[in-house]
Swiss-Prot record:
Protein's cellular compartments: Cytoplasm; Cell inner membrane
InterPro entries found in the cross-reference section: HflD (IPR007451), HflD-like_sf (IPR035932)
Protein family per UniProt: Belongs to the HflD family.
UniProtKB keywords: Cell inner membrane, Cell membrane, Cytoplasm, Membrane
Residue runs in coiled coils: none
Protein name: High frequency lysogenization protein HflD homolog
GO cellular component, one term: cytoplasm
Membrane topology classification: Peripheral membrane protein
The species this protein was found in: Pectobacterium carotovorum subsp. carotovorum (strain PC1)
Length: 212
């Protein structure tokens, strides 16, 4: 069956958007709240009607992720900010493979995310309560699967518990996009042999996103 590179590109952009958020938080302690909201909200949509629905049914919501994806696909450097983003993205994809191999962990992940619905009746998605709950899911379910993702940035910034929680919640969102990517036919060979197709799709989607 022919691959749907549009949907595959959207899910990859979701992974890359999470990587971007992690990088911004780790270095500055801040990130764009709209971008973070799109990423965290994707975790909650476990039965989407489409790939785009995971990201709020709006390509514009993935603009940062698409730009980050293009940067990763077009870079050959193994140093600097681009290399850091690549490492986060590929680490998330590797962790998703470990998650897929452990059905009990997948079940626990779904159960814990489902339990958030009650809290969301009382707290905003970006509230400290919900972000901390998402971070706890990442620590309890994902961090136990294998080598932890090494987040690099400002040591002072990374000491902040709220920044730590946002970083972990963003990593959880990256895992969600990696799961989606695999479900719709994504695979690591595409990143080597279908880069041109992915770049083309990402550019076409970005061309439809209005400049802000």
């Amino acid at each position: 069956m022919a691959k749907n590179y549009y949907e595959i590109t959207l899910a990859l952009a979701g992974i890359c958007q999470s990587a971007h958020v992690v990088q911004q938080l780790a270095h500055t302690g801040h990130c764009n709240n709209d971008v973070l909201h799109t990423s965290l909200n994707s975790v909650l949509n476990l039965n989407p009607s489409s790939t785009l629905a995971v990201y709020g049914n709006d390509e514009q919501n993935l603009k940062v992720g698409l730009e980050t994806l293009l940067g990763i696909l077009n870079t050959s450097s193994n140093k600097g900010a681009g290399a850091e983003l690549s490492r986060y993205a590929f680490s998330l994809i590797a962790l998703e493979r470990k998650l897929k191999a452990k059905p009990a962990a997948l079940d626990e992940l779904g159960k814990r995310i489902g339990q958030l619905e009650r809290q969301l009746e009382h707290f905003d998605l970006l509230s400290e309560t919900i972000v901390s709950a998402l971070a706890a899911i990442y620590v309890d379910v994902i961090s136990t699967l294998g080598p932890r993702i090494q987040v690099t940035g400002s040591p002072e910034v990374l000491k902040n518990s709220q920044v730590q929680a946002k970083v972990r919640s963003a990593l959880l969102a990256g895992i969600r996009s990696a799961v989606l990517w695999q479900q719709i036919g994504g695979g690591r060979l595409q990143l080597m042999f279908s880069r041109g197709q992915l770049v083309k799709e990402a550019k076409q989607i970005l061309a439809r996103c209005p400049s802000v």
